């Protein structure tokens, strides 16, 4: 029993352990709440930047296949077609979302795959026309461009065939040319008359082609240029800006909720006290004004009753002062109670004192004059 530690030391150790455990739990809880708050703010920042990018950035490039059709109800003995090849291309996604954005400049081109056949080489120049239309099929813009195959001499064609003969035999290469026709260099969408489709027509009945594609590429300037060419840098700056802004809002909200010292409420309480003081002052004036007619009537009754005045020879000046004392005591009592109703402010007490003195002065002089006239009579 001699080696046992003293009881106060055990109690002190237990108290210290409880305090440290409480602090540790509190710190863990605070760090957990802080970590969850940071994750939430970061997720909201990423979501806001993604929403802005999706709504602000248009489609960079749109490629649509062009399927030409022509009439076949004519004499088929000739090598030419019955009509010019025509194609109708829709400029909407899934029939709802439009490809073009308002105010954004676009470069519209038509890519033609033409074989190097003798017919196309003898064809020369031909015309390609595009007509953009809006709802209801109304044409809003038309553009025409001339096209022809690139010239290649017979010697150059023979050398090209010999060099790429193995690739041509196994189908890895073809004797064709890809022509890119620029239909619009700076096409802008009208917000009031949106473009819903385009009609493409090739003005040649003898043209031979493998396929065609309509390509729409956006030309970015300003902020869109930065977002498109530097996506990672802009994403980091945008998310960091959103996170900083949201963090400041959360910090001010926490300070207002916990401390309540950022925007003190003394101004509001001061306004309330001023209003209460004004209301109490008006009430005191109304009570004094109600009390004045009663004093005048009592004084007149003292003078006219039995034709005797308060200054009768049987009376003394001490009696006069004693008659005035009951009249002053209620007013002094009221003046002492009014400051208590106005939250104990000395301004209300001064106001009521001035009002009481101004109200008593005329009555005292009038009563003295009446007493003098009665005594002289």
UniProtKB/Swiss-Prot annotation:
It is found in: Endoplasmic reticulum membrane; Lipid droplet. Residues 349-361 have a biased composition (Low complexity). Keywords: Endoplasmic reticulum, Glycoprotein, Lipid degradation, Lipid droplet, Lipid metabolism, Membrane, Phosphoprotein, Transmembrane, Transmembrane helix. Residues 1-27, 264-377 are cytoplasmic. It holds the Pfam family Seipin. Residues 279-377 are annotated as: Disordered. Its main location: endoplasmic reticulum. It is a multi-pass membrane protein. The modification Phosphoserine is found at residues 289, 342, 345. It comes from the Eukaryota. GO terms for cellular component: cytoplasm; cytosol; endoplasmic reticulum; endoplasmic reticulum membrane; lipid droplet. Residues 49-242 are lumenal. InterPro entries: Seipin. Residues 292-302, 367-377 have a biased composition (Polar residues). PANTHER family: BERNARDINELLI-SEIP CONGENITAL LIPODYSTROPHY 2 HOMOLOG BSCL2 PROTEIN (PTHR21212), SEIPIN (PTHR21212:SF0). Plays a crucial role in the formation of lipid droplets (LDs) which are storage organelles at the center of lipid and energy homeostasis. In association with LDAF1, defines the sites of LD formation in the ER. Also required for growth and maturation of small nascent LDs into larger mature LDs. Mediates the formation and/or stabilization of endoplasmic reticulum-lipid droplets (ER-LD) contacts, facilitating protein and lipid delivery from the ER into growing LDs. Undecamer (an oligomer having eleven subunits). Oligomerization is important for its function in lipid droplet formation. Interacts with LDAF1 to form an oligomeric complex. Interacts with RAB18. Interacts with ZFYVE1 in a RAB18-dependent manner. Belongs to the seipin family. This is Seipin. The gene is Bscl2.
């Amino acid at each position: 029993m001699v080696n046992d530690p003293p009881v106060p030391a055990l109690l002190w150790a237990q108290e210290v352990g409880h305090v440290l455990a409480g602090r540790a739990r509190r710190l863990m809880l605070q760090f957990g709440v802080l970590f969850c708050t940071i994750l939430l703010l970061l997720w909201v920042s990423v979501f806001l930047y993604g929403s802005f990018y999706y709504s602000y950035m248009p489609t960079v490039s749109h490629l649509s296949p062009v399927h030409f059709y022509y009439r076949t109800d004519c004499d088929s003995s000739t090598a030419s077609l019955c009509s010019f090849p025509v194609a109708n291309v829709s400029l909407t996604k899934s029939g709802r979302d439009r490809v073009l954005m308002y105010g954004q400049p676009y470069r519209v081109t038509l890519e033609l795959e033409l074989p190097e056949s003798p017919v196309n080489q003898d064809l020369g120049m031909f015309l390609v026309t595009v007509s953009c239309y809006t709802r209801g099929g109304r044409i809003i813009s038309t553009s025409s461009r001339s096209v022809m195959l690139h010239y290649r001499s017979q010697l150059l064609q023979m050398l090209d065939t010999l060099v790429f003969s193995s690739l041509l035999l196994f189908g890895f290469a073809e004797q064709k040319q890809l022509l890119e026709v620029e239909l619009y260099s700076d096409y802008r969408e009208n917000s009031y008359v949106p473009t819903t489709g385009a009609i493409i027509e090739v003005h040649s009945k003898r043209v031979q082609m493998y396929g065609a594609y309509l390509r729409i590429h956006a030309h970015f300037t300003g902020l869109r240029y930065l977002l498109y060419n530097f996506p990672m840098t802009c994403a980091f700056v945008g998310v960091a800006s959103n996170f900083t802004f949201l963090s400041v809002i959360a910090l001010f909200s926490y300070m207002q909720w916990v401390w309540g010292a950022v925007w003190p409420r003394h101004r509001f309480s001061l306004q309330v006290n001023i209003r209460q003081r004004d209301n109490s002052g008006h009430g005191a004036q109304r009570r004094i004004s109600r009390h004045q007619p009663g004093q005048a009537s009592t004084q007149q009754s003292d003078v006219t009753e039995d034709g005797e005045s308060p200054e009768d020879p049987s009376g003394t000046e001490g009696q006069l002062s004693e008659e005035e004392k009951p009249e002053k005591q209620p007013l002094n009592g009221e003046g002492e109670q009014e400051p208590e109703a106005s939250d104990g402010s000395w301004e209300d007490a001064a106001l009521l004192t001035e009002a009481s003195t101004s109200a008593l002065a005329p009555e005292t002089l009038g009563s003295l004059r009446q007493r003098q006239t009665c005594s002289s009579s």
